[in-house]
Amino acid sequence: MLKLGIIGYGFRAFTMLKEILRTGKVVVSAVCDVNFDSVKKYAEENGVGEFNYYTDANEMLQKEALDGVFVGTRCSLHTDLARLVASYGIPLFLEKPVATNREDAAKLKEILYHSDKTVVSFPLRVTDIVLRVREILESGRIGTLSQVQAYNNVPYGRVYYHDWYRDDSETGGLFLQKSTHDFDYINFLLGSLAPVSVCAMESKMVFKGDKPAGGVCESCPEKDTCPEGPDRLREIGVDPTGNRCCFAVDTGNQDSGSAIVRYENGLHVVYTQNFVARECAAKRGARLIGYLGTVEFDFPSATITIYDHMSAKKEVIDLSADKGVHFGGDRRLAESFVAVMQGEPSPSTLAEGILSVEMCLAAKESTAEQRFVPIEFRR
């Protein structure tokens, strides 16, 4: 059995570990985290047996003979922990975003020697739906690609205003939290084409206000009438995802953001994300428009639609059987990580993670500075 160490055993590690353990090839040997009670709870739910517990990652790596390490800490710690694991030469599963600022991105470029031994948590690129769309593109069925229109209307956006995710000093903001996934699957679909520049804009129209900083729902005089209060959310069947006021002066995060990405051959991608959409308004996917046809796909409905420009024909491909977290991508990433621990190359390398971060940081800078920002990193 392959021996796995975990650094940061939070909810994301918990969900991914379900898939990793399901392969039947891995055991958890060691865990590093600062909250033992939480670790114990998640480990019991995952069915993890005995393991050695640490609060210092370097000590764990020194003492344990590990075949792989899963890093699932908060975002601001990803870079330094990736560098630490790489220094031991151990295969790494690294949560996204791999960095939250330019300085950390530069640090990661120093360990590109570890790129193929790193699986970055980009499950969308390995879903059945994205793999099938790439096959369609490579077949030439839609002809010369003219434009990509991508979108992500997030139905669970409350977490980015009620919980710790609202702190962009920790997360890097919502381009880095959400667009990093979408930019990556777009890069995957476009093959070897390199993005060269980005312009972007964001808006904050709903989740803002003049309520005091640091406010929590329990002590708010408007908790019984606020449409985002926990009691009101439970009434409509929604589990509250935090208790911090989303109409306070310190709410943070955009409500929506859009970016235009230019690629080296002149192609441009239009991407937009929204965190106010709810319930059946959820939508995530893209339209890729070519001379001969258009291929459109939607993750929530797991459908691909191909429109023939030379006739009135339309083909719909239903992939709804591929269920699971991240539309089945987590399962495939888990299998890939096990393969990397056995010596196979990664399907979502550190280089891909850095490129996505560079695009997100360019979008963030473009928003602040109102200019096109070049992307100089190449895979």
Please report, for each region that a protein language model flagged, where it lies by residue.
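N-terminal Rossmann-like dinucleotide-binding module
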Residues: 1-48
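Beta-loop-alpha module in the N-terminal Rossmann-like domain of NAD(P)-dependent dehydrogenases
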Residues: 10, 46-111
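C-terminal helix-rich "cap/oligomerization" subdomain common to oxidoreductases
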Residues: 25, 68-70, 264, 296, ...
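Short, Asp-centered acidic motifs that coordinate Mg2+ and/or phosphate
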Residues: 30, 67-68, 147
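Active-site loop of classical SDR/Rossmann-like NAD(P)-dependent oxidoreductases
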Residues: 34-37, 279, 323-335, 351, ...
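A contiguous active-site-proximal alpha/beta segment in oxidoreductase catalytic domains
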Residues: 76, 99-162, 167-175, 180-183
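Contiguous beta-strand/loop segments that form the cofactor/metal-binding neighborhood of enzyme cores
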Residues: 177, 181-301, 333-344, 379
